[in-house]
């Protein structure tokens, strides 16, 4: 409720979410561009425990995904996705750091060409 109230006051053009809460339909309807940065490769590792599952998995790649936020958890169309090798010799902390750095790279890319990604989003929504 607080997020909705605050966002309604500032009326953002782009809303970027980083947390694991289900977004209500009224929030998604009110704002045109709502994105979620998910610290796993979607659609492989959805949900609240997706991050830990991906880090502990035997999959050859792990990564980070920026997607359109939808009412259904982690179901939105993918806007940007970056991958790295999942090296079994690396500790979980090293893997976490690498994933967070991928998230930063994704956000830099997204905001460096925002018009392109907003047009891409409009096309994916239609």
Enumerate the predicted regions with their spans.
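Short amphipathic alpha-helix with an adjacent loop that forms part of the alpha/beta core around
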Residues: 2-10
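Donor/substrate-binding cores of folate-linked one-carbon enzymes
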Residues: 12, 16-125
